[in-house]
Regions:
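Short gly/ser/thr-rich secondary-structure transition/capping motifs
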Residues: 6-10, 30, 74
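Conserved class I S-adenosyl-L-methionine
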Residues: 24-32
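Conserved alpha-helix/loop element of class I SAM-dependent methyltransferases that forms part
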Residues: 5-24
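A short acidic, Gly/Pro-enriched loop at the edge of an enzyme's catalytic core
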Residues: 80-91
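Class I SAM-dependent methyltransferase SAM/SAH-binding core
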Residues: 33-81
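A short SAM/SAH-binding and catalytic strip from SAM-dependent methyltransferases
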Residues: 90-98
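A short, aliphatic-rich alpha-helical micro-motif
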Residues: 20-21, 41, 86
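Structural signature of beta-strand start/N-cap positions in the alpha/beta core
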Residues: 25, 46, 73, 88-90
């Protein structure tokens, strides 16, 4: 018997269970190379993706397909120094940042 576990599909299923992402304004803290950012955009979220590492932000921008460019904004920064008004976002995502 062969057992195949697809971690990407498991992650997408988990995201779908958490919320209806369509049209939601989402801030992703610690976006890294943008792997999760792309998943959120595919689910319909409007994502502001933040990471303190400028190299990772550049890599994330390069990986993002053009069709999602209007759904995602990348910023170099940290959670401690957000310059966004209260209630700017519907949801916040922190994944793999600790």
């Amino acid at each position: 018997m062969t057992l195949v576990i697809d971690p990407e599909q498991n992650e997408v299923r988990a995201l779908r269970r958490v919320a209806d992402w369509r049209g939601k304004r989402v801030i992703e803290i610690g976006c890294g190379d943008g792997r999760l950012t792309l998943r959120l955009a595919r689910l319909g979220a409007l994502v502001t993706a933040i990471d303190p590492d400028a190299k990772l932000i550049r890599a994330a921008r390069k990986k993002l397909p053009e069709r999602f460019a209007k759904r995602v904004r990348y910023r170099v920064g940290s959670a401690e120094r957000l310059d966004h008004a209260d209630e700017s976002y519907d949801l916040a995502v922190f994944a793999w940042v600790l």
